[in-house]
Amino acid sequence: LGIDSSQIVNQLTGASNKAAKQATSIFSGMGKKIAAGLSIAAFTKFTKDCLEVGSNVTEVQNVVDTAFKDLSGQADQWASNAMTNFGLSKLSAKKYMGVFGQMSNAMGITGQAALDMAEDVTGLTGDVASFYNRGTDEVYTKLKSIWTGETETLKDLGVVMTQTNLDQYALNNGFGKTTAKMTEQEKVMLRYQYVTSALSNATGDFVKTQDSWANQTRILSLRFEQLKASLGK
């Protein structure tokens, strides 16, 4: 497109960290550069994408507010740092946290415990995606198995969560009983600890490999997504 990529990255970085009003003024300058290299159809699609992302922000926020209630502010603050810590856009982080939180609520896990669990598994989603070079949505879907108990999806991540393995882990880690004698809530907590332990090698991978080409490309894409979210509000 004949656009200075370093200049675009700097503009995207600024836009993703400012309020919607400031993002609009930034877009007025950057948008001219983008528009100069895009067809009318492509620019129309960009505008449509902004509106769709903006709509998703509202829907995701509603789920977060419902799942965490008066703790939703903590969730928002955590998600604001998810890009640099885990390679997740704020929107994706809140989406994952909201769903994980709702699933925990359904199992009787609420309040701070539900939020802590959602943050841990959402962060793990970003790290595992970086470790295995997979899409974050794919990893997010697989990690739902912590709540659902599905085992096949986790094998792609090197986690073999058989009944035998879970029972042995429970006896070795202070649960004092096997899954046959556990409540559904206890089973969720067991799977949570088992999976996070099994994926411990991936923990912190995004930060460790942040300068890699794959992760730098991911960050650029995430900044562009956040710009769309700001413009679409």
Language-model region placement:
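Preference for small-residue-rich
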Residues: 1-57, 225-233
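Intrinsically disordered, low-complexity regions
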Residues: 5-9, 23, 151, 192, ...
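Small-residue helix-packing and pore-constriction motifs in hydrophobic alpha-helices
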Residues: 35-87, 98-109, 116-129, 138-212, ...
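Secreted/periplasmic proteins that engage bacterial cell-wall peptidoglycan
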Residues: 91
